[in-house]
Amino acid sequence: MNPDNYLYLSALLFTIGAAGVLLRRNAIVMFMCVELMLNAANLAFVNFSRMHGQLDGQVVAFFTMVVAACEVVVGLAIIMAIFRTRRSASVDDANLLKH
């Protein structure tokens, strides 16, 4: 398969994720869209790594997945704390936590 197709797929996935972050107000959906954007970047890194014949892109993608796993733990804990206090996962309700 042509490597350009993987780049187009990566750009499409990143665009869908960015649109989801900008258009949705639910924290869980926004969180999943951020993860989609990270996976799109990983796909691009691995594709560039394969095109150039080096392992640098794959190493970056691996460390990005490690950071994303840590982000999942912290992000879901924050979302659950917001849900427990406000009984809603809306981002607008998270603004009220500072009072």
Curated annotation (Swiss-Prot):
Location, primary (coarse class): membrane
UniProt topology in membrane: Multi-pass membrane protein
Keywords per UniProt: Cell membrane, Membrane, NAD, Quinone, Translocase, Transmembrane, Transmembrane helix, Transport
GO molecular function: NADH:ubiquinone reductase (non-electrogenic) activity; quinone binding
Keyword Membrane: yes
Catalytic activity: a quinone + NADH + 5 H(+)(in) = a quinol + NAD(+) + 4 H(+)(out)
The keyword rRNA-binding appears for this protein: no
EC number: 7.1.1.-
Gene Ontology CC annotations of this record: NADH dehydrogenase complex; plasma membrane
GO biological process terms on file: ATP synthesis coupled electron transport
InterPro entries per record: NADH_UbQ_OxRdtase_chain4L/K, NUOK/Mnh_C1-like
Location within or outside the cell: Cell membrane
Entry superkingdom: Bacteria
Enzyme class, spelled out: translocase
Transmembrane segments: 3-23, 28-48, 59-79
Protein family: Belongs to the complex I subunit 4L family.
Job description of the protein: NDH-1 shuttles electrons from NADH, via FMN and iron-sulfur (Fe-S) centers, to quinones in the respiratory chain. The immediate electron acceptor for the enzyme in this species is believed to be a menaquinone. Couples the redox reaction to proton translocation (for every two electrons transferred, four hydrogen ions are translocated across the cytoplasmic membrane), and thus conserves the redox energy in a proton gradient.
Entry-linked NCBIfam families: PRK05715.1-2, PRK05715.1-3
Subunit structure of this chain's protein: NDH-1 is composed of 14 different subunits. Subunits NuoA, H, J, K, L, M, N constitute the membrane sector of the complex.
Protein name, UniProt field: NADH-quinone oxidoreductase subunit K
